[in-house]
């Protein structure tokens, strides 16, 4: 089989399964409205959960800082790319979340890959929730450590896996809020079991940080858990992009030596770091509280109105509200019908989710209004 034949076969298999991914160029993809082909759609696909991507205070911070620092960092943080703006953001994040240190990364994917790659050796073991994000599972699969997966949120299964002999260290990996199901991990129970077996806990709280908990401190703060490694991202609740790893002083020093994704990547622009500082200020303020309260009210309204639809509604009180359709073709058809009626919704299919669980991944944001939720419910009932 030639290279071209190999590529064609893989693409043909995806097409045959109605699983071929496509991108749509949009004029605006975050906020209340998605704009594509000169048409405005109510946007139920964005991860901009607090509606901060268009916040004037954050935009102003980026503009002013771009004039001060320029539009790029100029290099890796280990060379010339670590600015006073990066340092200030790291210190503010660490203070906010109760850690000694924070290290910035250009993306959540890079942060997860960097930590697992740097921390794990062949004598160690990774024990991950089966539904953990692709960045976590890929890093675990590529690391020299054996990977064991426990059934989703099943602490008993986790305990059994941790109890089996391991010559090295054990790292338990999970998410705070799961990206495709919107449900939360039982972090307190997971941490207790992990500590009983002298393991460390790593939590990716991409979808909880900024959105839940006191001052938006996220899933771990809400459940009174402090994992040894906490990954937060800035493309969801913060409305920007990037990520950070929260940890102890010694772990931060270790990652600065051995985390190749950090060492060999150009740092985020200093102006972006300043915009993230502005975003953090909003998240921690009374305005942030008001946005979280509004989002919670929108979620309650949606869940109350969707109960009688012939789809499975995931057990989620987060901004992620998946409607599980099952069949790939049916999910694609339903997403297209909703778009035709002015609601932009994304169909998520295998391999992103397990086979037979194709779904509409609906996301609600504080930028929405109650009438937007009512319109979504109306369209769903028309096509249910």
Swiss-Prot record:
The modification N6-(pyridoxal phosphate)lysine is found at residue 236. Its cofactor is pyridoxal 5'-phosphate. GO terms for molecular function: 8-amino-7-oxononanoate synthase activity; pyridoxal phosphate binding. Pathway: Cofactor biosynthesis; biotin biosynthesis. Its EC number is 2.3.1.47. PROSITE patterns: AA_TRANSFER_CLASS_2 (PS00599). The keyword Transferase applies. SUPFAM superfamilies: PLP-dependent transferases. Keywords: Biotin biosynthesis, Pyridoxal phosphate, Transferase. Pyridoxal 5'-phosphate binds at residues 108-109, 179, 207, 233. It catalyses: 6-carboxyhexanoyl-[ACP] + L-alanine + H(+) = (8S)-8-amino-7-oxononanoate + holo-[ACP] + CO2. One of its GO terms (biological process) is biotin biosynthetic process. Substrate binds at residues 21, 133, 352. Pfam families: Aminotran_1_2 (PF00155). It is an enzyme of class 2 (transferase). Belongs to the class-II pyridoxal-phosphate-dependent aminotransferase family. BioF subfamily. Catalyzes the decarboxylative condensation of pimeloyl-[acyl-carrier protein] and L-alanine to produce 8-amino-7-oxononanoate (AON), [acyl-carrier protein], and carbon dioxide. Homodimer. PANTHER family: 8-AMINO-7-OXONONANOATE SYNTHASE, CLASS II AMINOTRANSFERASE/8-AMINO-7-OXONONANOATE SYNTHASE. This is 8-amino-7-oxononanoate synthase. It comes from Escherichia coli (strain SMS-3-5 / SECEC). The lineage of its organism: Bacteria, Pseudomonadati, Pseudomonadota, Gammaproteobacteria, Enterobacterales.
């Amino acid at each position: 089989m030639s290279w071209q034949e190999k590529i064609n076969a893989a693409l043909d298999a995806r097409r045959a399964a109605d699983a071929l991914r496509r991108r749509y160029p949009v004029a605006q993809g975050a906020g209340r409205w998605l704009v594509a082909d000169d048409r405005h759609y109510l946007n139920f696909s964005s991860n901009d959960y607090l509606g901060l991507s268009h916040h004037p205070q954050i935009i102003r911070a980026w503009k002013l800082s771009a004039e001060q620092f320029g539009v790029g960092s100029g290099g890796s943080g280990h060379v010339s790319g670590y600015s006073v703006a990066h340092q200030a953001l790291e210190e503010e994040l660490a203070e906010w979340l109760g850690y000694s240190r924070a290290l910035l990364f250009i993306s959540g994917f890079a942060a997860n890959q960097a930590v697992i790659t740097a921390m794990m050796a062949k004598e160690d073991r990774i024990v991950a929730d089966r539904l953990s994000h692709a960045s976590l599972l890929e890093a675990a699969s590529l690391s020299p450590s054996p990977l064991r997966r426990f059934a989703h949120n099943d602490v008993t299964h986790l305990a059994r896996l941790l109890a089996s002999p391991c010559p090295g260290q054990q790292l338990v990996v999970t998410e705070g809020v799961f990206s495709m199901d919107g449900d939360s991990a039982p972090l307190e129970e997971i941490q207790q079991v992990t500590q009983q077996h002298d393991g460390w806990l790593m939590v990716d709280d991409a979808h909880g940080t900024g959105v839940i908990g006191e001052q938006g401190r996220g899933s771990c703060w809400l459940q009174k858990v402090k994992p040894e490694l906490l990954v937060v991202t800035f493309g969801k609740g913060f409305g920007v992009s990037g990520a950070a790893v929260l940890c102890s002083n010694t772990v931060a020093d270790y990652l600065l030596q051995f985390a190749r994704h950090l060492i060999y990547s150009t740092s985020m622009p200093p102006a972006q770091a300043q915009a993230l500082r502005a975003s953090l200020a909003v998240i921690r303020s009374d305005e942030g509280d008001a946005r979280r309260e509004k989002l919670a009210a929108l979620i309650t309204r949606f869940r109350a109105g969707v109960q009688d639809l012939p789809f499975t509604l995931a057990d989620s009180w987060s901004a992620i509200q998946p409607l599980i359709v099952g069949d790939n073709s049916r999910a694609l058809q339903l997403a297209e019908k909703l778009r035709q009626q002015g609601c932009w919704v994304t169909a998520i299919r295998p391999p992103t989710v397990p086979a037979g669980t194709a779904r509409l991944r609906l996301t609600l944001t504080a930028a929405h209004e109650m009438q937007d939720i009512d319109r979504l419910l109306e369209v769903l009932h028309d096509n249910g």
